[in-house]
Design a protein with these regions (language model features):
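Cofactor-binding active-site loop characterized by glycine-rich and histidine/acidic residues
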Residues: 1-64, 82-88, 93, 98-100
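Conserved thiamine diphosphate
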Residues: 32-36, 88-120, 163-189
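Structural motif
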Residues: 39-44, 69-71, 133-135
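A short, conserved beta-to-alpha structural element at the edge of catalytic cores
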Residues: 64-84
Length: 231
């Protein structure tokens, strides 16, 4: 939610559930208005699709043929409630049918199929054919937070999904396609673990920030009125 990179046009998530959905359509509107061939990928979870803003956005996105791909990461439980308990039907992708929007499911546990499905939707948008609504059926192994006791599922269920873990599938695909060897993958794995550990060590050894930096990188304008009353 809090990962953001303006340089890479990655605009993060939103503190309000589903709040990013109309913003994503707005970005797509801006790109179309300026004649850009950019396509917006707007991600959301299975919990966010119960927000009314989704339907308002799908309607306008289809009406204006906006270059946006809506991608639902359906892990089956949102924060901790099964999708069967929140919807009359569990095929979330069918929500697109009500707006005559191209839509469909993709295997969210298979990165290759995800890439293929999204690439097809991007090409459709760039041709001027408007938005696509995709549901990536996936899974998460851990609770929504540290306080999540996960009473809503069994350990056997989690273990079954671990057998088709996306990272394992990518690794097998790389080896089968001879893009890399076991040794090269092992080296990459070690390098990544070392870099992550370095970041963790740096964070844990760093002092707490001063109160004076509380508002840094919050507002674009350095003279924003609210800043005159900051602590």
């Amino acid at each position: 939610m809090h990962i953001f990179s303006k340089e890479h046009r990655f605009h993060g998530g939103h503190g309000i559930v589903g709040g990013q959905i109309p913003l994503g359509a707005g970005m797509a509107f801006g790109d179309k208005y300026h004649g850009s061939d950019a396509v917006t990928l707007c991600y959301m979870g299975d919990g966010a699709v119960r927000q009314g803003s989704l339907h308002e956005t799908l309607n306008l996105a289809m009406l204006w043929k906006l270059p946006v791909v809506f991608i639902v990461e359906n892990n089956g439980y949102a924060m901790g409630t099964s999708v069967e308990r929140t919807a009359n039907h569990t095929d979330i992708w069918k929500l697109g049918l009500g707006y005559e929007m191209p839509c469909g499911p993709i295997d969210g546990m298979d990165p290759v199929k995800v890439a293929e499905g999204i690439s097809e939707a991007i090409n459709r948008a760039r041709k001027g054919d408007g938005p696509t609504f995709l549901e990536a059926k996936t899974y998460r192994y851990r609770g929504h937070s540290m306080s999540d006791a996960q009473h809503y599922r069994t350990k056997d269920e989690v273990n079954e999904y671990r057998k088709i873990d996306p990272i394992t599938q990518v690794r097998e695909h790389i080896l089968k396609s001879e893009y890399a060897t076991e040794e090269e993958l092992g080296s990459i794995d070690t390098d990544v673990k070392n870099r992550v550990q370095e970041c963790a060590d740096f964070a844990e050894s760093s002092p707490y920030p001063e109160k004076s930096v509380m508002y840094d990188a919050v507002y674009e304008q350095s003279d924003y009125p609210f800043l005159a009353h900051k602590l």
